Amino acid sequence: MSDYKHTLNLPETPFPMRGNLAQREPKMLKAWYEDDLYGQIRSAKKGKKTFILHDGPPYANGDIHLGHSVNKILKDIIVKSKTLSDFDSPLVPGWDCHGLPIELMVEKKVGKPGVKVTASEFREKCRAYAKKQVEGQKVDFKRLGVFADWDKPYLTMNFDFEANAIRVLGRIIEKGHLHKGAKPVHWCTDCGSALAEAEVEYQDKQSPAIDVRFIFNDQDAVVSAFDLADGHKGTGKVGTVIWTTTPWTLPANRAVAVHAELEYALVQVEDEGKQQRLILGSELVKDAMDRFGFNQFHVLGYVKGAALENLQVAHPFYDFSVPVIVAEHVTTDSGTGVVHTAPGHGQEDFVAGLEYKLEVANPVGANGVYLPDTELFAGQHVFKANASIVEVLKEHGALMHHHAITHSYPHCWRHKTPIIFRATPQWFISMDQANLRQDSLNEIKNTQWLPEWGESRIANMVEGRPDWCISRQRTWGVPIALFADKDTGAIHPNTQELIEQAAQLVEKSGIQAWYDLDPATLLGEEDAKQYMKVQDTLDVWFDSGVSHACVVDAREDLTGPADLYLEGSDQHRGWFMSSMMTSVAINGHAPYRQVLTHGFTVDENGRKMSKSLGNVISPQNVMNKLGADILRLWVASTDYTAEMTVSDEIFNRSADRYRRIRNTSRYLLANLNGFDPKTDQVAVNDMVELDKWIVGRAAQLQTEILAAYDSYQMLLVTQKLMNFCTGELGSFYLDVIKDRQYTAKSDSHARRSCQTALYHIAEAMTRWMAPIMSFTAQEIWEALPGERSDYVFTSTWYEGLQAPTNSQFSNDDWLEILTVRDEVNRLLEAARKEEVIGATLQATVNLYTGKALAAKLLALGDELRFVFLTSAVNVTEVDSQPADTQTTEIDGLYISVAATDAQKCERCWHYSADVGVEPAHPEICGRCVSNVDGEGEQRQFA
């Protein structure tokens, strides 16, 4: 028996079947950074049209988590796809470096500023800590395969950023948006000063818990708001009840709050023969009645909280009325569902009060004693006044219940004494005094929001948001570099010049320069006596929110407004909002053209990842086990606009999808063995018909994939890529061409036509994959034949995919033939199970069908057998089902399968009547003889 193996074109490639990504990727990364790949990309795209995706800064604290990975991978996919579209698309990564979390971490190590270390030393420790965190996160981001200017990131603690943030503040002042107001802060009456969050400790404290009745002014109006069960309005005064553990704040009460969507009940109560009506959260009626000791009561009707808005109630012991307002912080967790609101003594009360322009009453002095003009309680310390207030409530018939509770309460870390919330002067960006609210709403309309619901979400927030308090009493932050009049609080008339001078100092030496500054240096001796240096710092949301000015507008390689902001959906209230506010305030336009949001990662039960639940999957573990490309493929294969479910099983499924794509790519490469694109290409119109079809399909697919990338639909990209690899390409085309690839003459038209198709597909597919599976795409790129740039990332989408113009068969024709093939395969498999045949090549398939389908099948001639992977196919035109045939899913198609009587060719394994006809080759068929010793077979169709 002769060995014909050496006459076959067996597939061969150095591209391995196994990715071994966890081991291979770090080596590739090392080479990329040694080669300055990012710099090469920038050079290759210099002068091209720009696409700027501005990176929202993650907080420089702790390891990156899966949410960080999702965010950075999505950005990287978009930037790489834009680069392949021949845009110059730099990505400048950023970090948010100021604020409380870093201060808390540093405090654990060195203590609180002003105690064991000076404020200056504390800031240096914060800077060093943030720098270390940035470096740690940077390593992980790079490991993800994210391309960015990692050597020159923007940090909000960089001196130039801090200086530019101060300059933006100056421009906001210049445009008339800044004003000074009051806001409640933690206040220690023993220190006589405000406390930062970090200076607050929580300890158990016993407090009086009281239920207080407020009587409605317009009794008929409030009752008419209710949907009364039987039309009965009830009798007695109508009031509502609040529950509080801080009676001392009642002198500052300026409203009672309900929740717009909660249901409230109008309850008829009889107490010792007296009738009254009370409005309470319907879920809390039973608990409240038990607490009040009322046994006889019934509900008259119900209403949503929104219907009570703006009704007036009488203050329980002062001679004025306060409104009913709606507020988001109202719950039915405890109390009555109605909340006492004192804007001068609570953060949530303050925010709610801004919307209704409530007075921020603060009758309490710095020492915790009521001011002299405080009616009834002047001169009393607030905590000692609780008992007095309870007595006054009793006298006015307003006290419904009184008992003591022990609860967690904020205390001063120095004095270990209870603290209060007290309104103090703060700096605000006004939403209305210079039309910022309306201008922002107009710009929201001019921005494309993806998904579309983002527009209404942020618009509703802007419509309802209060003025933005931008001042913080922190140590580690950008200073509000202003000089304020010691008597009036007004800022210096030369503020614009002074801000620039302060910015220059900070640009040279960092924020410590402001704290070290002697005011007389900039103001002169006389003004320094009248004006004091503001010690407040800027809200960290201001820091990140001005990155459009400090980074996009400031760096030479970037231009604003940015084309895209991409962050989690929580950033409508956060970075998207602060960026919009500051940009509109100083520039009159939005800082972005498009805003895209992604959802959060949850486990298979829909729960957020948390250490306490033990359901955290770290990106580092996924990369170390499976590789970054698996993580990247998972991100791209998920509907990222909603919650993204993760589990080990889901990542393993992602690995399975990856293997299918890798194996398909390997098959393409292996069958390009010996192919030189310069000399061996066949023009598309000269190709075998099946090759024309697959190239045309790939060309159409590329159009669809590029459109999906342009609309940020990565899930659609991966679906189309997977469907191609498992369907038309993998299950059909690559299956059919094996015979031609392996057995045809190596340099024959039949084989070169096929190799040309494979080459075009491999060139295109590698680029389709590159934004998502970057490591694998580069690995394929290096294994492709022909001359090319060193990196797929410096190239553009493949332009060699040209649809043929002279195809004998349309795409619909081939899809119909493919459907017939599926039916043939189904019956071949049944014949194998019944042992009618062994391999499918042992079968003769007889097809009986109508005229139209028969004509298409017969047009393929003898090559139809290659499509069905059988040794013989007979097509007969019929009008009805012949005997001994089986019906199919295709109307009018009938099939029978029989074993062939022909002999098996030892080279191609087909069964043929002409095996052994050539004496020199007694074991092979005539086709193989031609391919071994002759001119080689001709293929026209398959």
From Swiss-Prot:
Q: Which UniProt keywords apply?
A: Aminoacyl-tRNA synthetase, ATP-binding, Cytoplasm, Ligase, Metal-binding, Nucleotide-binding, Protein biosynthesis, Zinc
From the Swiss-Prot or TrEMBL record, what is one GO molecular function term? Answer: aminoacyl-tRNA deacylase activity
Cofactor names from the entry are:
Zn(2+)
Xref: InterPro entries: aa-tRNA-synth_I_CS, aa-tRNA-synth_Ia, Anticodon_Ile_BEm, Ile-tRNA-ligase, Ile-tRNA-ligase_type1, Ile-tRNA_ligase, M/V/L/I-tRNA-synth_anticd-bd, Rossmann-like_a/b/a_fold
Description of how the protein assembles with itself and partners: Monomer.
What family is it from? Belongs to the class-I aminoacyl-tRNA synthetase family. IleS type 1 subfamily.
Tell me the domain comment: IleRS has two distinct active sites: one for aminoacylation and one for editing. The misactivated valine is translocated from the active site to the editing site, which sterically excludes the correctly activated isoleucine. The single editing site contains two valyl binding pockets, one specific for each substrate (Val-AMP or Val-tRNA(Ile)).
Role of this protein: Catalyzes the attachment of isoleucine to tRNA(Ile). As IleRS can inadvertently accommodate and process structurally similar amino acids such as valine, to avoid such errors it has two additional distinct tRNA(Ile)-dependent editing activities. One activity is designated as 'pretransfer' editing and involves the hydrolysis of activated Val-AMP. The other activity is designated 'posttransfer' editing and involves deacylation of mischarged Val-tRNA(Ile).
Report what the protein is called: Isoleucine--tRNA ligase
What species is given as this protein's source? Pseudoalteromonas translucida (strain TAC 125)
Q: What is the lineage of its organism?
A: Bacteria, Pseudomonadati, Pseudomonadota, Gammaproteobacteria, Alteromonadales
Q: Which gene encodes it?
A: ileS
